[in-house]
A protein has these predicted regions:
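Membrane-embedded transmembrane helical bundles of large multi-pass transporters/channels
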Residues: 1-170
């Protein structure tokens, strides 16, 4: 129960700070909300996957902290790359469709290989005999995978739907 209250406390501090920074960086609430969407998707999906794993193997409760921290951090990080590239492509005169495709081809590749590097590194913790580290390997790999998928699938889809409204209020 303490872990859950710690996670909630951390999120109550981290999310408002992240919103302030994202609004400052992106200049609009709409654009600032997209990285939080990616982070939230990564966290929720990872909780579900880890819950499934917990039915078959021991999982450290501390892996939930890893999921929330990495999920929010990577969701924001990867989204910054993708959104900035999409905005650049729109500023260069590409249509919304063209900008989305070009963004996934370029920034999507960067996010994919960055995530692959982090995921493989975290997965290597699974080779240690301690359950604590093995559960971190599963949780870490999962949340990185979900953040990457969110950034290269869900985020471009959201930007495609929003179009130039992403800059509304700028």
């Amino acid at each position: 129960e303490t872990i859950y209250s710690d996670i909630i406390t951390a999120e109550l501090i981290a999310v408002p700070l992240a919103i302030l920074v994202l609004v400052f960086v992106f200049g609009t609430l709409v654009a600032a909300g997209l990285p939080l969407m990616v982070g939230a998707l990564a966290i929720v999906a990872s909780f579900f996957v880890v819950w499934i794993f917990s039915q078959f193997t021991d999982m450290s409760v501390f892996s939930l902290n890893l999921i929330t921290g990495l999920g929010l951090g990577l969701g924001i990080d990867y989204s910054l790359i993708v959104i900035n590239r999409w905005r650049e492509e729109r500023a260069n005169g590409l249509s919304i469709d063209e900008a989305t495709v070009k963004t996934v081809e370029t920034a999507g590749r960067t996010v994919f290989f960055s995530g692959l590097t982090v995921a493989v590194t975290l997965l290597s913790l699974g080779f240690f005999p301690q359950m604590f580290l093995q559960s971190f390997a599963i949780s870490g790999f999962t949340v990185v995978l979900m953040a990457v998928l969110g950034a290269i699938i869900a985020l471009p889809a959201a930007m495609q739907l929003l179009g130039d409204r992403i800059n509304k209020g700028k």
